[in-house]
Amino acid sequence: MTITKEKIAFMLNAELGFSKSLCEEVVNAVFTNILDIAKEQKLILKNFGSFEVKHKNSRPGINFHTKSQITIEPKNILRFVPSAKLKALINEND
């Protein structure tokens, strides 16, 4: 299931009764702040998980279509590690 910021704002509106525009502003502000923090340092959301930007150096790779060797460019990746509580919550119905 894909959930959008608009859907989260709609759920806040339905749950709390605040105006749609206020809910959209709050959701946008929360995501903007989370992204700003995650770019600079490890971000831990208690009982949810942690986000961290990791740098991957360039490395050799293979183009599967041509079978030729290529160099994969360095890049930053976002790593998410779920908390133990979130893992337990997801797996409690199994």
Curated annotation (Swiss-Prot):
Transmembrane segments: none annotated. The keyword NAD does not apply. GO terms for cellular component: cytosol. SUPFAM superfamilies: IHF-like DNA-binding proteins. InterPro entries: Hist_DNA-bd (IPR000119), IHF-like_DNA-bd_dom_sf (IPR010992). Keywords: DNA-binding. This is Histone-like DNA-binding protein. The lineage of its organism: Bacteria, Pseudomonadati, Pseudomonadota, Alphaproteobacteria, Rickettsiales.
